[in-house]
Amino acid sequence: MLVLSRKAGEAIRIMDDIEIKVLAVEGDQVKLGISAPKSVDVHRGEVYEAIQEENKHAAKPVSAEILQAFINHANKAST
């Protein structure tokens, strides 16, 4: 892990198109401003972890019984 020290108003550049700027330091809290292209996802750590957990649950296999019930329901709705 690269560790860099920055003061309020100073920035870190990543490649040509990402900038992380220290906006303020207040007690034990640091406010960061992040400029990045829309194609780059930027999340707080806890939000990213929650997204990953949701993705794991969504990717779980569906049982044959649940799948058959869904098909039966869809068939009834279309008639």
Curated annotation (Swiss-Prot):
It holds the Pfam family CsrA. Keywords: Bacterial flagellum biogenesis, Cytoplasm, Repressor, RNA-binding, Translation regulation. GO terms for biological process: bacterial-type flagellum organization; mRNA catabolic process; negative regulation of translational initiation; regulation of bacterial-type flagellum assembly; regulation of carbohydrate metabolic process. Gene3D superfamilies: Translational regulator CsrA. Its main location: cytoplasm. One of its GO terms (cellular component) is cytosol. One of its GO terms (molecular function) is mRNA 5'-UTR binding. It is found in: Cytoplasm. Homodimer; the beta-strands of each monomer intercalate to form a hydrophobic core, while the alpha-helices form wings that extend away from the core. NCBIfam families: csrA (TIGR00202), PRK01712.1 (NF002469). A translational regulator that binds mRNA to regulate translation initiation and/or mRNA stability. Usually binds in the 5'-UTR at or near the Shine-Dalgarno sequence preventing ribosome-binding, thus repressing translation. Its main target seems to be the major flagellin gene, while its function is anatagonized by FliW. Belongs to the CsrA/RsmA family. This is Translational regulator CsrA. It comes from Shouchella clausii (strain KSM-K16) (Alkalihalobacillus clausii).
